[in-house]
A protein has these predicted regions:
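ABC family nucleotide-binding domain
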Residues: 2-205
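Conserved beta-strand-loop-alpha-helix hinge in the C-terminal portion
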Residues: 205, 213-229
Length: 229
């Protein structure tokens, strides 16, 4: 199975601080990998590098077979739009746009706008009945599903989710996890960043960070499913 991404000896230095120190691991296509660690372990710095919001001080980041370690500004933007879907704990929705328009705005940045594709994306996350609703008219779980639809509209190679259920109650957390499990079955590559050990167990493997170092990588033989929450 091919790699969706691979990190080779990644380091990130801020002044005298090594936020990431010699991080190496790979994520196979269609795999769900959970990245875990306590506060200050380097998770946020790693997400910034994986999502091309920042560059490593040293090391190589291979994304879909391409070296994404030191791209110029134009190529970085192109890679981010075409290869990566991002879901955050905060929703970052445009408050005065409808659910449909919030999905379509991601298409504008991709130079291809198709309302039917946006509708299908919302249908896939169970929001076909909320097309004209604004974010303030949606529940927290619905807003996060809208964010997932937006992140998937351009068919990225990998979905990076940073604490995606951090602001949700248990019922909505189950809905989001069920959706991620469905996406994995469809072959989508998922990288979930979380401090919650229970959520980490839904992945095919867990990458543990501590003090900026790779502490352990554990393969999960039988990943959890949402009805076990």
């Amino acid at each position: 199975m091919q790699n969706a991404l691979e990190l080779k000896n990644i380091c990130k230095i801020f002044g005298d601080v090594k936020a990431l120190d010699d991080i190496s691991f790979e994520v196979k296509k269609g795999e769900w990998v959970s990245v875990m660690g306590p506060s200050g372990s380097g998770k946020s710095t790693l997400v910034n590098i994986l999502s091309l919001m920042d560059t490593p001080s040293s090391g190589v980041y291979m994304l879909g077979g391409d070296d994404a370690s030191n791209l110029n500004a134009d190529d970085t933007l192109k890679f981010r739009r075409e290869k990566i879907g991002l879901v955050f704990q905060q929703f970052h929705l445009v408050p005065y746009l409808s659910a449909l328009e919030n999905v379509m705005i991601a298409q504008y940045y991709h130079s291809s706008v198709d309302e039917e594709d946006a509708k299908k994306a919302l249908e896939a996350v169970g929001l076909s009945h909320r097309l004209t609703h604004r974010p303030s008219q949606l529940s927290g779980g619905e807003q996060q599903r809208l964010c997932i639809a937006r992140s998937l509209i351009n068919e990225p190679e990998i979905l990076i989710a940073d604490e995606p259920t951090g602001n949700l109650d248990e019922a909505n957390e189950r809905i989001i996890l069920d959706l991620f499990c469905k996406l994995r079955k469809e072959g989508k590559t998922i990288l979930l960043v979380t401090h919650n050990p229970d959520l980490g167990e839904y992945g095919d493997k867990i990458v543990y960070l501590r003090h900026g170092k790779l502490e352990n990588i554990r393969t999960i033989e039988n990943p959890k499913v949402p009805n076990e929450i």
